[in-house]
């Protein structure tokens, strides 16, 4: 994958997160902000989830209260390079914990 393809795929991921949060009807408020390629989810309790792109590695990084995760694109799915879990699974787990209620991105 070249840099422009990586940015296109990351932009698609960012847009999917924004759209899913816009349509989410949970009790908690989750704010989504994009600044310079970094997507920040802010929760009512003051905690944050940071998602950013690592262009040189063509990876997406996810920082949560539970820890940091690095994702490579494999077969059209962002997959953690350590655990093999998908980006969506880990994001849902972290968002659910930080929001204090079930958060789904699917």
UniProtKB/Swiss-Prot annotation:
Keywords of the record: Iron, Metal-binding
Annotated SUPFAM superfamilies: Frataxin/Nqo15-like
SMART domains for the chain: Frataxin_Cyay (SM01219)
GO biological process: iron-sulfur cluster assembly
GO cellular component: cytosol
InterPro entries, alphabetized: CyaY (IPR047584), Frataxin/CyaY (IPR002908), Frataxin/CyaY_sf (IPR036524), Frataxin_CS (IPR020895)
GO MF annotations, alphabetized: ferric iron binding; ferrous iron binding
Function according to Swiss-Prot or TrEMBL: Involved in iron-sulfur (Fe-S) cluster assembly. May act as a regulator of Fe-S biogenesis.
Family: Belongs to the frataxin family.
The protein's name: Iron-sulfur cluster assembly protein CyaY
Organismal lineage: Bacteria, Pseudomonadati, Pseudomonadota, Gammaproteobacteria, Enterobacterales
Gene name of this polypeptide: cyaY
